[in-house]
């Protein structure tokens, strides 16, 4: 009894298992057909889950960008177009499109663009800093050049001022030297010459000079040769004495081309100046005619008049 029950249970379980197996096989057959049928417009490699060559190369480039330092980035970027061209050739053999690129690859591409933008920004800042340094150096060079030119101009001005001061000093010394020489000449002119008076004391020389001046004032018009004979001097010595006396203001007058000295007193000169000032513009003929009335040329002493004639 027990054996029959066990056999019946075993047969029932076997029937159930066979039935479930047949049902499962029946349901799995349509799905297998659908999966086995190739998808139109989708590459076979994508249907099989194998990554495309272009995607593999792109992933490799992204990993290279992350591992290579910033300096060789530019060199690596130059080699990328060649790999890109081969990728496009491989993609031409595949009938797929970029719409089915995995999401991870897109994220890697975006990360590379951000890093590239960051590196470009750093490069831009570096170039800007170099430009600022260059401008600063140029400005320093320009300022140094301007400072050197300014200093050179100041040196030139100082040198010119020094030369001007030296020239004024030399001119003053020369003027003083000439004045001293003229004084010595005037002093020597009144010394007794070999053919003149015998050497006397200082009082005699002063008296002789006073007589010389008074003689000219009394005679008004004197012949230089006669004056030299009267005082036992040479004619050139007489001329030198008269010029020295004119220079210091003791005598006023003119030496004409006939060898005569015409003495004109300061009072007579003032009268002539007053006449010219009153008349305004005066011709030489009018001045000569009026001078006969303004200037008295008559000798004071008769003896002096005979000598002058």
Curated annotation (Swiss-Prot):
Cellular localization per UniProt: Endoplasmic reticulum membrane
Stretches of the chain found on the membrane's Cytoplasmic side: 24-309
Major subcellular location class: endoplasmic reticulum
Phenotype caused by lack of the gene: RNAi-mediated knockdown in adult neuronal tissue results in reduced adult lifespan and progressive locomoter defects due to neurodegeneration. Neuronal cells in these adults display defects in autophagy.
Annotated GO biological process: protein ufmylation
Transmembrane segments: 3-23
GO molecular function, one term: ubiquitin-like protein ligase binding
Region (Disordered): 32-53, 79-175
Annotated membrane topology: Single-pass membrane protein
Lumenal topological segments: 1-2
Coiled coil: 120-177
Signal peptide: none
Annotated Gene Ontology cellular component terms: cytoplasmic side of endoplasmic reticulum membrane; endoplasmic reticulum
SMART domains: DDRGK
Biased composition (Acidic residues): 87-96
Basic and acidic residues composition-biased segments: 107-175
Family stated for the protein in its record: Belongs to the DDRGK1 family.
Known role: Substrate adapter for ufmylation, the covalent attachment of the ubiquitin-like modifier UFM1 to substrate proteins. Required for ufmylation of Atg9; protects the nervous system during aging, possibly by stabilizing Atg9 and supporting its function.
Subunit comment: Interacts with Atg9; the interaction is transient.
Protein name from the UniProt record: DDRGK domain-containing protein 1
Organism: Drosophila melanogaster (Fruit fly)
Encoding gene, per UniProt annotation: Ddrgk1
């Amino acid at each position: 009894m027990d054996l029959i029950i066990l056999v019946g249970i075993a047969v029932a379980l076997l029937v159930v298992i066979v039935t479930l197996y047949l049902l499962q096989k029946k349901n799995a057959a349509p799905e297998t057909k659908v999966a086995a049928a190739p998808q139109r417009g989708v590459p076979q490699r994508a249907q099989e889950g194998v990554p495309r060559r272009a995607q593999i190369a792109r992933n490799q480039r992204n990993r290279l960008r992350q591992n290579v330092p910033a300096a060789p980035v530019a060199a690596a970027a130059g080699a990328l177009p060649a790999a890109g061209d081969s990728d496009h050739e491989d993609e031409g053999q595949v009938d797929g499109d970029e719409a089915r690129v995995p999401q991870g690859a897109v994220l890697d591409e975006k990360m590379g663009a951000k890093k590239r933008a960051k590196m470009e920004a750093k490069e831009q800042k570096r170039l800007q800093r170099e430009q600022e340094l260059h401008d600063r150096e140029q400005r320093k060079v320009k300022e140094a050049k301007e400072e050197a030119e300014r200093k050179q101009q100041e040196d030139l001005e100082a040198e010119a001022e020094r030369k001007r001061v030296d020239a004024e000093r030399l001119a003053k010394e020369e003027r003083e030297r000439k004045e001293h020489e003229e004084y010595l000449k005037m002093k020597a002119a009144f010394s007794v010459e070999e053919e003149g008076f015998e050497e006397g004391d200082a009082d005699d020389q002063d008296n002789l000079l006073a007589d010389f001046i008074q003689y000219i004032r009394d005679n008004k018009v004197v012949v230089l040769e006669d004056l030299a004979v009267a005082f036992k001097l040479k004619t050139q010595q007489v001329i030198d004495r008269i010029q020295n006396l004119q220079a210091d203001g003791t005598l006023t007058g003119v030496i004409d081309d006939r060898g005569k000295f015409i003495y004109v007193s300061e009072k007579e000169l003032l009268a002539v100046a007053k006449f010219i000032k009153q008349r305004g513009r005066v011709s030489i003929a009018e001045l000569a005619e009026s001078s006969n009335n303004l200037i008295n040329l008559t000798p004071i002493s008769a003896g002096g008049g005979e000598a002058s004639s």
